Amino acid sequence: MYRASGIQYEHSDRVRGLASGGIGAMHRLAQHTGLVTALDAHVALLKQHLPYHESDHVLGIAYNVLCGGTCLQDIELRRQDEVYLDALGAQRIPDPTTAGDFCRRFDEADIEALQAAINETRVRVWRAQPAEFFDEAVIDADGTVVETTGECKEGMDIAYNGLWGYHPLLVSLATRRSRCS
């Protein structure tokens, strides 16, 4: 069995660790590629931007997922994490209730506007690539059964494995891990 001995630990009160250490880099990427600006330009759901813009809500939800969050309520864990907030350069982020209210404002046109902001940014990133970037493309397609308990989910049915769910198909550029629209 395990018999660790002679181990000593030191720590400092100034040590600040973050399990999702790359979240600051992800936010810098969103800024550098123009995604933040594109989200604010295309998605218009808020009458006032006090204190949050549309990009703050969209990216807050995305960052929650990147940090292992599985539901909007997990945003509260991020809100209480001082190191997470510092990594993003934020004093505060929208709470889960506000994020839910934001999501409920979307209609079909708003979803298309959100997708337009993402696509505009994707095209800008692709155009910045050198010519050899486009020498080879491998397209990958895969599907999965997504379990749901929603009673009104369009296309929901009982799957081969006995789960109630739906079957999205994801097509991506395998060499670049980029989703094809």
Each predicted region: which residue ranges?
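Dynamic "connector" segments at or just before major functional cores
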Residues: 1-181
